[in-house]
């Protein structure tokens, strides 16, 4: 497929092209009268909380920005600036296929397409990211897609007839977003530091930020071993997967309730990020983890079927 793919999930926007893949979390940091986005902004979240906005994708609108953050009038201005930065970092591809979550409202999708018209690329397609993923990993029966966003989780229910995968509904899981999960995981890790070393990394913004920064590496280690060490500011604490499991219980319970009674042919697909949560895979026997580049592979599989260079772009929610 000659068109680049932009996966819009505020935990980590990803833009794939023929020769590159760019990642950029949905964080904006005010620097003077300008903004920094992505990993650089996220690494300042605990250090400069008043200069950070991480809600601009979730609350995409043209309502006045509250609280104010520099020259941006509304979250749409921040989305516009973030899109331009990601596009530049990816080598400025001429055309983009946009993959969006089912939690985005119709008005937000329309606004997003309007914003794209003021960017140096052409949006030639708009597809539900769960439908795109399901078309690659499908099989007959019900398919559930579990994804993490910064401020909530989302469970999307799909139906696969063998000929077509279609989105049936999307169920937000409030209080189960990445930020809430991080807070619970950090609390567990900080308790381990206090218990083992009497050092509390949450006492200072710099060490608290360091703890947040090393958390993903710790979770990756716990995916393959029962315990791991976390080091912050010269102090080291040992944490176990069993310790961390309680942090994800709210998400596991909410997802279980949203899926209802499971059938033998049902399948669950989890994004790689949510699959790092200790205890998740043990809780769902029918769960498989999507590859990190699964959406890009699915887009390439469909080729130009998803591309519309003539007329208006519509949100695709079912795919062969």
Predicted regions and their residues:
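Phosphate-binding glycine-rich/basic clefts of nucleotide- and phosphate-handling proteins
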Residues: 160-243, 266-277
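Small-residue (GG/TT-enriched) beta-loop-alpha framework at ligand/catalytic clefts
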Residues: 98, 106-195, 249, 253, ...
């Amino acid at each position: 497929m000659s068109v680049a793919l932009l996966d819009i999930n505020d935990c980590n926007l990803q833009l794939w092209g023929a020769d590159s893949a760019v990642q950029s979390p949905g964080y904006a940091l005010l620097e003077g009268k300008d903004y920094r986005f992505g990993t650089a902004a996220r690494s300042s979240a605990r250090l400069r909380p008043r200069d950070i906005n991480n809600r601009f994708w979730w609350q995409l609108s043209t309502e006045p920005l509250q609280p104010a953050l520099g020259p941006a009038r509304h979250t749409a201005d921040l989305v516009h600036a973030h899109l331009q930065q990601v596009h530049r970092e990816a080598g400025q591809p001429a055309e983009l296929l946009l993959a969006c979550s089912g939690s985005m409202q119709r008005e937000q999708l329309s606004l997003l397409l309007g914003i794209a018209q003021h960017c140096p690329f052409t949006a030639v397609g708009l597809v539900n990211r769960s439908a795109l993923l399901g078309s690659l990993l499908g099989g007959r029966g019900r398919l559930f897609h579990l994804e993490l966003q910064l401020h909530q989780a989302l469970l999307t229910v799909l139906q696969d007839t063998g000929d077509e995968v279609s989105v049936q509904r999307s169920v937000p899981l409030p209080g189960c977003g990445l930020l809430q999960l991080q807070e619970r995981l950090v609390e567990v890790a900080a308790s381990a530091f206090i218990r083992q070393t009497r050092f509390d990394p949450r006492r200072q913004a710099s060490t608290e930020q360091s703890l947040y920064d090393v958390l993903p590496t710790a979770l990756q280690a716990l995916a393959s071993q029962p315990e791991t060490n976390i080091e912050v500011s010269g102090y080291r604490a040992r944490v176990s997967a069993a310790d961390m499991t309680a942090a994800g219980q709210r998400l596991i319970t909410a997802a279980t309730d949203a899926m209802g009674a499971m059938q033998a042919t049902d399948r669950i697909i989890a994004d790689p990020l949510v699959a790092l949560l200790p205890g998740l895979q043990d809780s769902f026997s029918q769960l498989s983890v999507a590859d990190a580049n699964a959406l890009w592979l699915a887009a390439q599989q469909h080729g130009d079927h998803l591309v519309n260079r003539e007329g208006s772009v519509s949100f695709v929610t079912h795919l062969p």
